[in-house]
Amino acid sequence: MSISQKRASEIVDALRRGTVPRTSLDAFCVGLERFEPAVDADLDAVAAGRGVFKAVRGDYGCGKTFFTRWLADRARKRGFVTSEVQISETETPLHKLETVYRRLMERLATADTPEGALRTIVDGWFHVLEEDVLAEGVAPEDTERLVTRTTALLEQRLAGVTNHAPLFAAAIRGYRRAAVAGDRATADGVLAWAAGQPHVAAQVKKSAGIKGDLDHFGALGFLQGVLTMLRDAGHAGLLVVLDEVETIQRVRSDARDKSLNALRQLIDEVEGGRFPGLFLAITGTPTFFDGPQGVRRLEPLAQRLHVDFQTDSRFDNPRAVQLRLPPFDLDRLCSVGQKIRDIFRGTAVAPDRVAARCDDAYIRRLAEAVTGHLGGKVGIAPRIFLKKLVGDVLDRIDQFPDFDPTRDYRLTVNDTEMTRVERQASGAKDLDGIELEL
């Protein structure tokens, strides 16, 4: 597919840093075509007002983060707001829903705003309300009447939110009052409080008629309020990704059980219709879904997420509640490398030299070499392979006319450039894999 030079540069820059790009992932994805019809059907269902839940299952290196960012990119192109929250035992524990909500708000993204889009959504909603008032015949120059009618319409639209999250509704009213009055500092503080931020000044909260901080029980009500606003503002819905949920296996047993119960509650609420317009996705390893320290600890959750994966993976059902991502193989790794090389050419000073010196045969040699350095495990190779391809090979070919990777480049992979999970996965797996000096 053809993409702009700006998009190509964003992809290349992210891979050079060893991270997954956030946009245009369909330009170089390989092997996800089988999921497209089911994913699009789910997005259509959410846009029509349903709630949808999906669990994405795969070992490290299968591309879970890539899949969810591909899904988010696809959703934003359809008018969705998206948010990716990385679950961790210290910064974002799953059992503290108020913290999950705060992270979710911090990472709200639209097609035009890559992060922190809450203000854009709220202001966009106010604009829609004003447009509706103008459509009634109120003159644009009649500022006083426009504000009065818009405020009245805001109260009508907030009626449903007030029932389940009165403090959220109060915060939105307070934000609008401060914004209309030109008090930006108060408006910012009130909106931060509505986004779950602690330590908002008492005077700011008092001006909006709110008090205290968001707690575990109020978080889901606030999420309902956000959904109401963004859908009323013309957005198709909200996609929330909870990434690396398997990390809850490493916390204390009481926190683990609370986290599993919080996940069960979220799934029940989504499927029970509390969150129309919400697509909730989680990612986890097979051990999380099948092991004794994961989903199986909570029987109701295990029942909801159970899918039989004993059958041939070619016939996995993309409509099931749990999706199994296939592991990377060498051919798939090479295909991705070829696509990245072609995207890089769109940003290169010497695109013809890039194509000539990094041909398909060299890409396969590099893929085999990286995989060999990682103990032959193709599944953990994609991130490092693409980082080496872009930063060590393609950049040098483009900048140095004399550079020939077959002659001038020797692959090295150091522990310092690998993630903890990559180091663990590439190490010895059993006693036979440990070398002893005798």
Regions found by a protein language model. Name each.
Residues A55, C62, F66-A233, R396-P401:
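P-loop NTPase nucleotide-binding core
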Residues F66, E130-V133, I248-R252, T412-E422:
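Eukaryote-specific, cytoplasm-facing alpha-helical/coiled-coil scaffolding segments in long proteins
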Residues M1-V52, L146, D402-L438:
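A short, basic N-terminal segment
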Residues R176-A192, Q197, Q203, S313-R319, ...:
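C-terminal alpha-helical "lid" subdomain
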Residues L25-E33, G61, L94, V161, ...:
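Conserved phosphate/pyrophosphate-binding and hydrolysis machinery centered on Walker-type P-loop NTPases
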Residues S2, R7, A187-C358:
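The catalytic "switch" region of P-loop NTPases
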